């Protein structure tokens, strides 16, 4: 087992969480402004994300999807309530502890890839490990690279890669540290349908084969259908949930949120 470095003020986190959700929010409120200008972005949200599950978050524009994700990972504070990653209360952490948590336990995949243009694919993939001065698990790295089919593109820089290939690099980067949970924000938003499907199939495989936990924000019913479960938000509240979603059934739920 790889030992974690000692970091001042860093919480003690479990290596694996089985009995408790990978992430959860309890009675979360997030407000901006006050009085007549107050906007409630999250309104008494209680939601949990099971370890080893794939959950999609959907809802109309302005429903609170991005706010929920930002609060779950400690990038933004909730006004009241509690947020947990595993058994650790993110709400009680200081900024140093939250930074450590995101580096050690959370993976991110963004719509815009967020690759360093001067680095090769392999250098981008291992960059988080290098910055943290951690030894790279080369056996696991080889497994991830093989899964995303990047073996013949490792020495290419981002401008030499297609959009789909760049996103595969981003997914590999998120996985290489074996995070407790991956948060994906519209990961196929900048891709064509074929490249997007490749990314979604890979994310699905990481859940099925490696037990990875994924929480994905998406507006696309086809993308969301790869998840085990969808949480629907509307006006900052949990409006509905769907288990085993299908592309045909999801639009009906979205229409109901707009009525």
Q: Language-model segments: which ranges?
A:
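Pre-NBD coupling/linker segments of ABC/ABC-like ATPases
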Residues: 2-18
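Conserved beta-strand-loop-alpha-helix hinge in the C-terminal portion
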Residues: 237-259
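ABC family nucleotide-binding domain
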Residues: 20-227, 233, 238
């Amino acid at each position: 087992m790889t030992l974690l470095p000692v970091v001042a003020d860093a919480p003690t986190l479990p290596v694996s969480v089985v009995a408790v959700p990978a992430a959860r929010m309890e009675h979360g409120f997030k407000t901006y402004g006050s009085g007549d200008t107050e906007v409630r972005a999250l309104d008494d949200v209680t939601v949990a994300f099971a370890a080893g599950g794939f959950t999609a978050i959907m809802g109309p524009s302005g429903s609170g999807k991005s706010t929920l994700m930002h609060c779950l990972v400690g990038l933004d504070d909730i006004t009241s309530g509690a947020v947990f990653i595993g058994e650790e209360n993110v709400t009680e952490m200081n900024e140093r502890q939250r930074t450590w948590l995101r580096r050690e336990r959370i993976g991110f995949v963004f719509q815009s890839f967020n690759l360093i243009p001067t680095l090769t694919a392999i250098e981008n993939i291992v960059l988080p490990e290098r910055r943290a001065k951690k030894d790279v698990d080369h056996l696991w790295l080889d497994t991830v690279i093989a899964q995303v089919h990047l073996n013949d593109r490792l020495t290419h820089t981002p401008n030499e890669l297609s959009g789909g290939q760049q996103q595969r690099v981003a997914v590999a980067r998120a996985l290489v540290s074996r995070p407790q949970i991956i948060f994906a924000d519209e990961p196929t938003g900048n891709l064509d349908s074929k490249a997007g499907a490749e990314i979604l199939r890979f994310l699905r495989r990481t859940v099925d084969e490696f037990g990875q936990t994924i929480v994905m924000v998406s507006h696309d019913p086809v993308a969301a259908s790869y998840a085990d479960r969808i949480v629907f938000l509307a006006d900052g509240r949990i409006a509905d949930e769907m288990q085993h979603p299908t592309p045909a059934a999801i639009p009906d739920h979205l229409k109901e949120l707009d009525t």
